[in-house]
A protein has these predicted regions:
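A surface-exposed, glycine/aromatic-enriched loop/edge motif typical of exported proteins
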Residues: 43-93, 150-182, 243
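"Short basic amphipathic alpha-helical interaction patches in structured regions
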Residues: 14-19, 104-106, 156-159, 245-246
């Protein structure tokens, strides 16, 4: 038997990962002619990271945002997340990538949470009929295995206000830092970064099992070897999932469906398959 724990934090923004693994097993002889075995193993994991709802999302998009961020443009000015609007300080037609502010997203409730929970069970019981002279070489074995996989994903994506500095500093009016920067609210133009504008929750489960009954015979009579095998197997598997999403969450949402604006659109999808 054994168990292990693994934890990791990101060196780039908000990222937490935790995972537990466990395993146990036993093999036993029940008298001279019968033996049994049993094993159980599983894991539980959870990952949380800030949600990047643009350019494909994920940590790769975050890395790209940081690599292409202009070093002379601070993330915040006067407590407001700012974006670079070009040498001409344009006020429209900015793409979502241009509006993306890495720190603003990191400081928002926007989050992706993935949880997994897996378990495997295996057991067998075997009996040797060698205790009776007419059934020597005859063995009967029954085995059972089951696998259960559970997954859950929660996503929070809001709309975040980011800002354009209307009158920049310096003699050329292009600097974002300096003592001459006007920090009054009137010197900031507002843009909206759409980082998904929805809440989603997805849950899925896969449950499968297999049973085998095997009758085998192997015996030598003088110069002759006689053997045979008979087996019966039964297996079933089922999968089901449910997904729900709702639009227009508040900027202070806690990820629940009641923390959204009036008139938000809510949808639910679910399915189940068996084999």
């Amino acid at each position: 038997a054994g168990a292990s724990y693994f934890s990791q934090e990101g060196n780039m923004g908000r990222l937490d990962y935790d995972r537990w693994n466990f395993r146990a097993g036993v093999n036993a002889n029940i008298g001279k002619w019968t033996k049994a075995s049993f094993q159980i193993s599983g894991d539980m994991g959870e990952q949380n990271n800030a949600r990047n709802g643009i350019s494909g999302g994920g940590t790769d998009a975050d890395f790209n945002s940081l690599m292409t961020h202009l070093p002379f443009v601070p993330d915040y000015i006067g407590g407001r997340p700012v974006v670079y609007t070009g040498m001409q300080n344009v006020s429209s037609n900015l793409t979502a990538v241009q509006l993306y502010n890495f720190r603003a997203v990191q400081n928002s409730p926007d989050n992706t949470e993935n949880q997994t929970n897996n378990m495997s069970i295996n057991g067998s019981l075997e009996h040797d009929f060698g205790w009776f002279k007419w059934t020597k070489g005859l063995k009967l074995k029954a085995s059972y295995s089951r696998n259960i996989v559970n997954g859950k994903s929660n996503n929070i994506g809001t709309k975040i206000n980011v800002y354009r500095l209307l009158n920049r500093g310096g003699s050329g009016g292009h600097l974002y830092t300096g003592d001459d920067i006007d920090l009054d609210e009137s010197n900031f133009g507002t843009f909206t970064l759409d980082n998904g504008n929805l809440l989603t929750r997805t849950m899925n489960k896969t449950d499968s099992y297999q049973m085998n009954l095997t009758l085998s015979y192997a015996r030598q009579f003088g110069l002759h070897n006689v053997s045979g095998l008979f087996s019966i197997e039964k297996a079933e598997s089922e999968y089901e999932y449910v997904t729900g999403n709702i639009t227009d969450p508040f900027s202070f949402t806690d990820g629940q469906s009641n923390s959204t604006a009036t008139g938000a659109t809510q949808t639910t999808t679910f399915s189940r398959t068996e084999s």
